[in-house]
């Protein structure tokens, strides 16, 4: 059958590939999460401390007696499963090897969970590399809602793959998969896959995130900044406050992840586009000439996809110089910035396409990479 509208294709594709559609005889359901996080970045020591409140809705027909969290930073050390996998591969990932084997104790990544409760009751948990298994104080019945509260400390790894500090272009912090993250549960059960440098799958929900760090830093992130008048840095008309630190407050709805990047040397361009979408470009001054046309290209890319796959469903899109190549996250992408202009155009167009596939689609990238790549 010939479909004239790409929007119809996207709709049908989503219906045919959602977990609910594959679960014969079961009604459609998805788990839902609502994160509230308050974190402080200790820039000089490359560490972070934070608190997380997670409202978890069990919309499945199953009673849950355990939950699982991903602790992605634990992958970045010479003894992790990701390191071991690459140690024995005939064709190891050149972005990981040999760097991961040379990480010193102050360069590795880790998460330490200092407390975890369910509706106020302390919980026991075990950590296996990048996965934390939690025994619940009481089961979560179908339709049940619980609140998990957590305190954690983390060391931000030297950038090896996607996330970390001090990437090869001198960006201080590329913060992807940076928080203890609830694994997804669907009709196939828990997807608590160990992290070996591959892809992601998570439940949709909301994020309310406060990040405190030195006032010289400029942040690009998922979501909308809630306090631009307190921040400046191009988000508001105010000058950068003369304080030691600033707390940035972001909110995002109907997303399955939250990422951010921070550097004291970012330039920040803001472009207002069609359909009330705001575009943010963050890059360092030494690549400004290469980024000159990005203020034209980025809105054109999103508008192109919007005409073909359905309107871009979020209020903003951020392109930020960070990471180790190109990687998509809700409402933003991290890309290397010191490449030729046509390279910037190509990688941005590719990553922007992920705002629909897998961003809106929400497919399991780990199992079904063909759906979005």
Stretch-by-stretch model annotation:
Residues 52-54, 69-71, 144-158, 207-215, ...:
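Short, hydrophobic/aromatic-enriched beta-strand segments in well-ordered soluble domains
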């Amino acid at each position: 059958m010939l479909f004239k509208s790409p929007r119809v294709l996207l709709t049908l594709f989503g219906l045919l590939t959602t977990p609910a559609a594959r679960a014969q005889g079961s009604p459609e359901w998805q788990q839902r999460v609502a994160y509230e996080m308050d974190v402080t970045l200790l820039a000089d020591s490359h560490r972070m401390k934070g608190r997380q409140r997670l409202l978890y809705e069990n919309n499945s027909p199953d009673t849950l007696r355990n939950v699982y969290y991903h602790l992605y930073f634990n992958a970045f050390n010479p003894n992790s499963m990701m390191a071991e996998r690459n140690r024995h591969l005939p064709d190891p990932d050149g972005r990981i090897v040999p760097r991961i084997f040379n990480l010193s104790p102050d360069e590795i990544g880790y998460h330490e969970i200092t407390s975890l409760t369910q509706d106020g009751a302390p919980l026991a948990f075990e950590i296996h590399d990048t996965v934390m298994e939690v025994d619940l104080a009481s089961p979560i019945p179908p339709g049940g809602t619980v609140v998990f509260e957590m305190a954690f400390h983390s060391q931000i790894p030297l950038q090896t793959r996607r996330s970390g500090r001090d990437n090869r272009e001198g960006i201080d912090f590329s913060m992807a998969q940076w928080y203890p993250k609830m694994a997804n549960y669907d009709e196939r059960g828990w997807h608590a896959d160990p992290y070996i440098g591959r892809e992601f799958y998570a439940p949709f929900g909301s994020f309310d995130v406060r990040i405190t760090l030195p006032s010289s830093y400029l942040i690009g992130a998922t979501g909308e900044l809630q306090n631009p008048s307190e921040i400046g840095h191009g988000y508001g008309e105010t000058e950068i406050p003369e304080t030691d630190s600033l707390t940035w407050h972001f909110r995002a709805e109907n997303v399955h992840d939250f990422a951010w990047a921070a550097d004291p040397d970012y330039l920040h361009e803001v472009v207002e586009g069609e359909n009330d979408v705001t575009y943010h470009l963050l890059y360092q001054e030494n690549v400004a000439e290469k980024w000159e046309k990005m203020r034209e290209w980025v809105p054109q890319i999103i508008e192109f996809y919007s005409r073909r796959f359905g309107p871009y469903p979020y209020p903003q899109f951020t392109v930020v110089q960070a990471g180790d190549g190109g990687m998509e996250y809700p409402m933003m992408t991290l890309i290397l910035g010191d490449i030729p202009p046509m390279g910037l155009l190509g990688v941005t167009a590719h990553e922007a396409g992920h705002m629909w596939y897998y961003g809106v689609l929400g497919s399991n990238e780990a199992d079904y990479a063909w759906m979005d790549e």
